[in-house]
């Protein structure tokens, strides 16, 4: 359909520490553009930026997005993000949201420090917290999709995430506010 929006996910921080927090770089971002024109959508959060690349940015501060799923009925976007050795994350994407990955620690670290938190709420108190984390060990999450249809029974509407470690499928049930139900 003309004017249909789409989400394009850029690679993680491409192993350069300052890129995830630099909104004029496309690394470590969720980008939103019009499929017909290739231009950024006019309601993107940084559309008035003087920098052309920043106009495409929908959210930033991501480490390594491996999967994206759009929730049927709501249009909410979730990402599956692979952590370094811990704390894989599932994030509910918010317009203009900073997801807190900063391996350069606001320039205090030379290079790329993978030991920093996936979502650093101390360095970025306004960062958007993950709706799910793997904890102390990575599960190497990658693909993401929503189960849709009555054939899924009680799982209809669940978010499923594939995990490379242990070759498993994680099934996450979501609350109305988008958080993961325990």
Task: State where each predicted segment sits.
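Beta-propeller domain segments
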Residues: 3-181
């Amino acid at each position: 359909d003309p004017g249909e929006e789409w989400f394009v996910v850029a690679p993680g921080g491409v192993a350069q520490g300052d890129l995830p927090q630099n909104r004029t770089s496309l690394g470590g971002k969720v980008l939103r553009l019009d499929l017909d024109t290739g231009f950024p959508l006019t309601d993107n959060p940084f559309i008035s930026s003087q920098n052309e690349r920043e106009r495409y940015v929908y959210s930033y501060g991501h480490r390594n997005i491996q999967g994206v799923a759009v929730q049927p009925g709501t249009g909410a976007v979730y990402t599956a993000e692979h952590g370094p050795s811990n704390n894989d994350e599932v994030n509910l994407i918010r317009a203009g949201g900073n997801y807190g990955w900063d391996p350069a620690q606001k320039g205090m670290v030379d290079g790329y420090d993978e030991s920093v938190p996936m979502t650093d709420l101390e360095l970025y108190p306004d960062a958007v917290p993950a709706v799910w984390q793997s904890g102390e060990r990575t599960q190497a999450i990658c693909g993401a999709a929503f189960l849709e249809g009555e054939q899924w029974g009680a799982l209809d509407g669940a978010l499923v995430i594939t995990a490379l470690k242990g070759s498993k499928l994680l099934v996450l049930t979501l609350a109305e506010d988008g958080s993961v139900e325990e």
